């Protein structure tokens, strides 16, 4: 039984993946397993219920045994549409979102973000990563939010809002800085995927 039963985990796999050639990114192999499997394996100890946000290939995603939630908005409306789909189906106090294409995300992501949310009484906490030079980079799709933000998000989307940072600015939000920048490496292109496999010592 997870310590985080009050947190629903949402894997964002609903994008168009244009830079991956339009292939459904969650089903692309990484180190011998689809990216969605890596996401599930890292999330399963950090959340209670798990949802998968997908807008195609529902039958293939359903094989993993978790509910599939599609965007209400048409035409691949971006991660905020995925957030809205997850919040609409979220039955717990909090929703933790992660993208399907960052297979090395921190195993203490949920714990640290949950603590920050409680400490600051925020509506929403997002991750940031710090590189070797000390520069901090926002990682906004790694996000823990209270389910009460759904109304705000739906209103933002109805006004054709798409930019995550603009929606965050409407809420009480804060960030947690993770020093391991590599944990947030993503795989937007086939070359990035192969480079990340190589960095992990994987030889196909």
Residue ranges and their predicted role:
Residues 2-161, 166-185, 190-204:
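Nucleotide and nucleotide-moiety/phosphate-recognizing core
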């Amino acid at each position: 039984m997870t310590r985080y039963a009050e947190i629903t985990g949402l894997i964002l796999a609903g994008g168009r993946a244009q830079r991956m050639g339009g292939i459904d990114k969650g089903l692309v192999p990484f180190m011998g397993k689809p990216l969605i499997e890596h996401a599930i394996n890292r999330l399963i100890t950090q959340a209670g219920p798990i949802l998968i946000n997908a807008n195609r290939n529902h039958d293939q995603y359903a094989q993993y045994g978790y509910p599939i939630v599609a965007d209400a908005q048409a035409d691949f409306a971006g991660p905020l549409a995925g957030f809205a789909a997850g919040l609409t189906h979220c039955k717990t106090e909090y929703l933790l979102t992660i993208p399907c294409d960052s297979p090395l995300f921190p195993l203490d992501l949920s714990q640290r973000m949950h603590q920050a949310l409680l400490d600051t009484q925020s509506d929403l906490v997002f991750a940031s990563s710090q590189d070797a030079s000390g520069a901090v980079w926002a990682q906004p799709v790694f996000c823990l939010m209270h389910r009460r933000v759904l109304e705000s998000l739906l209103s933002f989307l109805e006004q054709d809002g798409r930019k995550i940072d603009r929606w965050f600015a409407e809420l009480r939000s804060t960030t947690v800085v993770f020093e391991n920048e590599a944990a947030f490496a993503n795989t937007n292109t086939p070359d990035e995927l192969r480079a990340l496999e190589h960095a992990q010592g994987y030889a196909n």
